[in-house]
């Protein structure tokens, strides 16, 4: 019995129907500003009145807590191995943004098995009463844990920079997602943000370039959510362990994060008006199909 089937049985037995919006933020390579994207979008969502919890899914190398300047008492080890509830391991950061630590420097968290991943994904449903949006901040690359969260999420936000390696690795990540036997293109919607661009045109060109290849070879539709300019204020905020959206709301990057958050909320409103089901977790998706990926 695979993980997807286990989760569907859990839902049938417990009648769990999550309604919190789940957005998984990911990247093909490290160092592209993915975690900064996660925390600043969370802050912008809070400014819009949304309740937000971040799951730091970069297991063993978690850095959301560092960027928030917080010291969590608990992490996912306490959920997976100690039997604590997921609500017990939430740390509340600035502006009442909650986050769940993936465990920084904990070797056992860097190579979680499928049972542990199932436990984490299952427990996300229990956050429904506490939050409107769950942001899953994955590690970079195409590890099993990253792909499990991508196929389990209704929305994937891909962070890419103009660097050739970032573009190539982003395509490799999407190809791995496309080949995953449980990937459902009708369930998981892929969005992209161009980060650290010199201007708006560069961001649009970057998206058009990647989207053309993805559309041709993978047939995965992508939605462009906008770009974030290269801004020294971001690094200054990181050094002071305060999100730039709080430290300097007028910074170019902060304004860009705000526009992206607004677009993402508009996208959710459009879905609601069309009376489509909210995209949450894997066990609300259609049954998986066995498919052969040739490319």
Q: What are these model-derived regions, one by one?
A:
Residues 24-83:
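Walker A/P-loop NTP-binding active-site region of P-loop NTPases
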Residues 138-226:
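Conserved catalytic-core segment of NTP-binding enzymes
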Residues 57-129, 239:
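P-loop/Walker-type NTP enzyme "switch/lid" segment
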Residues 283-292:
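Conserved small/polar residues in nucleotide/adenosyl-binding loops
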Residues 250-270:
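Extended, charge-rich low-complexity interaction segments
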Residues 104, 127-146:
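Switch II (G3) loop of P-loop NTPases
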Residues 215-243, 257:
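Beta-strand-loop-alpha "switch" segments that mediate conformational coupling across diverse proteins
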Residues 1-28:
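Extreme N-terminal, non-catalytic leader segments
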């Amino acid at each position: 019995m695979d993980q997807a089937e286990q989760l569907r049985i859990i839902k049938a037995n417990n009648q769990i129907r999550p309604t919190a919006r789940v957005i998984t933020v990911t990247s093909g390579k490290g160092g592209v500003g993915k975690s900064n994207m996660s925390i600043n979008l969370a802050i912008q969502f809070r400014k819009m009145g949304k309740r937000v919890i971040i799951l730091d899914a970069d297991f063993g190398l978690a850095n959301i807590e560092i960027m928030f300047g917080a010291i969590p008492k608990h992490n996912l080890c306490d959920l997976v191995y100690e039997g604590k509830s997921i609500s017990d391991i939430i740390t509340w950061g600035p502006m009442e943004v909650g986050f769940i630590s993936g465990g920084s420097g904990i070797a056992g968290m860097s190579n979680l098995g499928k049972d542990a991943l199932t436990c984490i994904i299952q427990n996300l449903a229990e956050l429904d009463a506490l939050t409107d949006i769950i942001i899953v901040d994955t590690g970079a690359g195409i590890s099993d844990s990253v792909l499990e969260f991508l196929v389990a999420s209704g929305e994937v936000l891909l962070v890419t920079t103009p660097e050739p390696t970032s573009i190539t690795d982003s395509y490799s990540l999407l190809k791995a997602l496309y080949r995953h036997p449980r990937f459902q293109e009708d369930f998981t919607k892929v969005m992209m943000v161009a980060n650290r661009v010199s201007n708006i045109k560069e961001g649009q060109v970057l998206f058009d370039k990647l989207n053309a290849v993805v559309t041709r070879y993978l047939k995965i539709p992508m939605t462009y959510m906008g770009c974030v300019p290269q801004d020294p204020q971001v690094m200054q905020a990181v050094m002071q362990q305060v999100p730039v959206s709080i430290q300097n709301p007028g910074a170019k990057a902060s304004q860009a994060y705000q526009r992206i958050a607004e677009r993402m909320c508009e996208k959710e409103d459009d879905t609601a008006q069309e009376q489509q089901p909210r995209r949450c977790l894997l066990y609300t998706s259609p049954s998986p199909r066995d498919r052969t990926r040739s490319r």
